[in-house]
């Protein structure tokens, strides 16, 4: 399988804290059981830092875009607004997309709605089921994987 890792708001936050306030890293990572990202001195291990720092904000495929949050279609150069790609919540179809679908996350969405978007061959497919949002009910709390070739949706219930 080809996997497309993306820069998102959590990655941006981690990089920001790593550079601006490395002493805050433990506070950020401990509740997430992610202290293994840190070296003995409490800094992000260089291999992880380099990997995260070099993540792209989006991928342009033949028939779709993959992005963490979405695109700011209210500006001329939508594909240069990296803040929006990591943080935006609402965006719309625009001719700048050249008919491509947008597959994104960042906004927890009911599994039933995600399935409907896929079945309807929607131009927007949100692949965020709020893996850590199990408190929202049984329609949330899954890690989602979408196979671009087979159009199959896979999900794993949060077991933490």
Label the predicted regions:
Residues 16-19, 76, 114, 136:
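Short, function-defining helix-loop hinge/capping sites that tune catalysis or transport
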Residues 81-156:
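Conserved beta-sheet core of the metallophosphoesterase superfamily
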